[in-house]
Amino acid sequence: MYVTPALLFLSAYLILPTLETVYLSFFDGRSRNFVGLKNYVFAFTDHTMLVAFRNNLLWLVLVTGISVSLGLIIAVLVDKVRYEAIAKSIIFLPMAISFVGASVIWKFVYAYRPAGAEQIGLLNAIVTSLGFAPVGWLVERSVNNFALIAIMIWLYTGFCMVILSAAVKGIPADVIEAARIDGANSWQIFWRITIPMIRSTLLVVSTTMVILVLKVFDIVFVMTGGNQGTEVIASLMIKEMFNYRNFGRGSTIAVILLLLIVPVMITNIRRFKAQEKLR
């Protein structure tokens, strides 16, 4: 009885739109003619879609791996040092900036002008001062995806650090002290005590980052608009749905994105329930 309003709200604003999206994915661009699996065949054979899948995989590996690794390293290194609060505040600060705001900031960092012209972009100013030619960080296909990925790493390393820092501080001091008495060095303590004892938190942070990366859109949209081979699944979905007005293909891409995210969410929920039972 008490959860009925919440269930009604969930049905109206989550379940019904999801079912409608799945339904539209089996129709043509105008949602008039049933086309079966044609849109799904398109999604897994179209060159642009395959590029988007490849880019999302690249984001998934690099952003998740580097953000979590850096967050863990920083959490361990600054633990219990005098300037811990200041260091953590500075590293966490980018989290206060929206994706769009961060993209605008980094546009100035990556700004490019032809060789011989004064460089207003911070990165190209450094490059040219060292005697090299300026680089079109957002237009050269060999580097533009990595340039975009760096933005999200900058944004979310602080998030990973804060969560993992709390887990590191939760390790009993007597366990660490006993290990030191037994002759364990810092490296052994890190791999044999710290990592095993915060493994559940590491998994939660990693899966959370996976979900965030799969949904990435703002950075790509603001920085490149998905051009020059930087398309990702979410940006392609927006283009098909709103730019090209192809509701069938747009819905299909949305369903695929949902199918990629839901298993990760379910894994997180199950892990949370398992931890609750242990408490």
Curated annotation (Swiss-Prot):
Keywords attached to this entry: Cell membrane, Membrane, Sugar transport, Transmembrane, Transmembrane helix, Transport
Record GO biological process: transmembrane transport
Highest taxon listed in the record's lineage: Bacteria
Consequence of gene disruption: Inactivation of the gene results in loss of the ability to take up glucosylglycerol and sucrose, as well as to accumulate exogenous trehalose. Insertion causes leakage of glucosylglycerol from the cells into the medium.
Cysteine pairings via disulfide bonds: none
Entry keyword annotation includes Ion transport: no
Subcellular localization: Cell membrane
Membrane protein topology class: Multi-pass membrane protein
Membrane-spanning residues: 7-27, 58-78, 90-110, 120-140, 146-166, 202-222, 247-267
Induction, as annotated: Expression is very low in cells grown in basal medium but increases significantly after a salt shock.
InterPro entries: ABC_transporter_permease, MetI-like, MetI-like_sf
CDD domains tied to this protein: TM_PBP2 (cd06261)
Annotated Pfam families: BPD_transp_1
Transmembrane helix keyword on record: yes
Record domain ABC transmembrane type-1: where: 53-270
GO cellular component, one term: plasma membrane
UniProt family annotation: Belongs to the binding-protein-dependent transport system permease family.
Subunit structure: The complex is composed of two ATP-binding proteins (GgtA), two transmembrane proteins (GgtC and GgtD) and a solute-binding protein (GgtB).
PANTHER family from the UniProt entry: ABC TRANSPORTER PERMEASE PROTEIN, OSMOPROTECTIVE COMPOUNDS UPTAKE PERMEASE PROTEIN GGTC
Stated role: Part of the ABC transporter complex GgtABCD involved in the uptake of the osmoprotective compounds glucosylglycerol (GG), sucrose and trehalose. Responsible for the translocation of the substrate across the membrane.
Name by which UniProt lists this protein: Osmoprotective compounds uptake permease protein GgtC
Upper lineage: Bacteria, Bacillati, Cyanobacteriota, Cyanophyceae, Synechococcales
